[in-house]
Amino acid sequence: MKYETVIGLEVHIELLTETKIFCSCPTKFGGEPNTHVCPVCLGLPGTLPTLNRKAVELSVRAGLAAGCGIAPVSRFDRKNYFYPDLPKAYQISQLYLPLCQNGSVTLDSGKTVRIKEMHMEEDAGKLMHSPDLNRTLIDCNRCGVPLLEIVSEPDMNSAEEAVEYLEKLRELMRFSGVSDCRMQEGSLRADINLSVRPQGESKLGTRTEMKNLNSFRAAERAIKSESERQIRLIERGEKIIQETRRWDDGAGVSFPMRSKEDTSDYKYFPEPDIPPVAISPEEVERIRANMPELPQAKRRRWQEKYKLSKADTDTLMSSPFTAELFDRTTAVCGSARDAAAWINVELPAVLRGAGMSIEDANFDPDSLGRLINMLSSGEINRGTAKKVFAKVVTENAEPAEYVRKNGLGLLTDTAAIEDAVRRVLAENEKSVSQYRDGKTQAFQFLIGQCMRALGGKASAATVSEALKKLI
């Protein structure tokens, strides 16, 4: 019998706010444990939450990016459960009136994955297990960090579709300025709800939830493993238990964590300390008007205007920084082809050599365009351009100033170049004779000797012209 896998995803993204959703503690990643906390996010008695309006605005922006409808009034609810990383013993979330509903993401195949809703909530803390101390430690820095939970419908049927959905959703959230979606820092986390059923059947099977997925590769492996596990159980006549499972990517297997709760288990009720959130149509339109260009529109513009290949476009769209760098570089140098080549080939090489990631890059995006102009005008050669670009990327150097200070500009003094060529010809009479006898390889040898004599500070085209004139 053939089986169909049915997948729905719950994706949590951290919103790009400076402070937490209900207090003024910073959201910065990587602080010393339990230093970004206050009585509000620790849930101490007598404290009251104050809603961060920036979190609401970013959530509306996310909803608009995915084509959601924005609720004119939404509200918060308390989700009650006990866990060590949740000091209040409840999480402020949205169940009954979420902010955004009925959006979608379209895959390359044309298939639409529906988004049921997006709702705001606060993050919990983080548990860290210390084998040396034989203790589990709690870091509450993450408590109260604003999250947007994006809940899809169960519209995906393979690991590949689920990963593509995650990639497109991440791209959408990053380019709309909602979240940096860095999985390694936990600012994008995905829970997988999965069931299997005989092909052609409409009734859904018993689902499990998979957690601890810290990369798209882990998500793909976990989906394939869980689908195979459930099919094996069905074929053996065993019952699938509705449960939450933890994925161990190193071992390539999942383990039961706890029985899967239903909504009723959390005893939701309206949050009494936060009034309903009203969003006027005028505010929604203001946010829409200030939205950055979204990925689909940017891809279409590049391919229509610059005739970029899909491969080049995909690489340039790997981060908002490289996309902006391409647009700014093209505007300065006028050549989309040159801009794409430097960003897609030279930039990764520089980053690798410096042990940096694209997130570490922090240079003036116009610098590359100015550098390409210097190369095109003959002020520097390509080898020098590569050296200067490395300094631009790693030290935010200004190309023209760096070239001037380090004497890297090409010689433009025709007399000096011709003097060097004459010396080379006098020292290599045999090669000169070979060239005059029709051996073209000798000419290339002479160009190399001239370039060496000039210390590489002349263009090969200028040297070739002088050599032809004097030989």
Question: Where are the regions a protein language model picked out?
Answer:
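Core structural elements
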Residues: 186-198, 303-327, 336-354, 366-368, ...
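Structural motif
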Residues: 330-339, 379-380, 437-441
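Active-site lining segments that contact anionic ligands and/or coordinate catalytic metals
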Residues: 263-265, 297-299, 311, 353, ...
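Amphipathic alpha-helical core segments of compact helical bundles
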Residues: 16, 193, 197, 228, ...
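Basic, nucleic-acid-interacting segments
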Residues: 1-293, 304, 308-310, 331-335
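Strongly charged, low-complexity linkers/loops
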Residues: 358-369, 373, 382-452
